[in-house]
């Protein structure tokens, strides 16, 4: 199992002799609009708070998240990024058998493997545009004594998403704990696809979110989990460090979730840019482009005249980075993923890709 994170900009920029800001990174799935201006100003205005320990209860941060997600503050757990909560939850549950919706993010399998867990993978199929039939998925879960089901929603890298109605059906018709990673949920219609409002009614549901992607803050390492399961909450909290969220992350979090202007503008802009990229990429006769509810798009080189790794190298020479997806189990060397950047950058990507396919 290989890692399927985005590009390491520090390493790439060093090798190319460039500044990180000179690279157009279509591989990392981070909001190109940056982070909330109000949240950054709050950090500046309160910079002297670094001399004080954070509130160990994180009352104001949890209240901000509660209002944002519509969940009770008592059902919120905080983590140093979503990855810490993924690790903590799987470690606490210590499953013997798990269902993993695949292909997907490598950290899930990595953490499940640490528990010596038998992993039953349900592979979505390209023939179905990577869409998952909820009844087939439920039958797969129930076909074995699985302790836990891991779902990335929307799924990275395929872009498929279960609606919250489908997620409720999964919860009602299975016995396993359900872990849903909603890292990319804000890039789609949360009223249709987010399951946060199911948390208070289903104590077998554990939702994980991070602020790295939509809120453009990978550097502050802030994530949160939502569950009404008291045993899970108490077990995870007892295993986390007392002050696992630093002061700057706390200040930003208290403000960013209330910045409605940033949230609305990001959603509208990136939805529009995703549709632009989907339309333009779909016009390439060499590509099969898969629908997406995330801020990224999975494409397959159906003509097989060139591999994704070769396209990546050509683009890299032009300071453009895309994601070669062969490290995702279930995908081959002809799949690549791009995320949405600003319109000029997206247009340049399309123009450059056209020149590559014309010359092949």
Task: For every predicted segment, state its role.
Residues 165, 317-318, 327-360:
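PLP-dependent enzyme catalytic core of the Aspartate aminotransferase-like
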Residues 270-271, 284-318:
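Conserved PLP-binding catalytic core of the aspartate aminotransferase-like
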Residues 128-186:
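Active-site phosphate-binding strand-loop segment of PLP-dependent enzymes
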Residues 54, 66-88:
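Short loop-beta-helix segment that forms the pyridoxal 5′-phosphate
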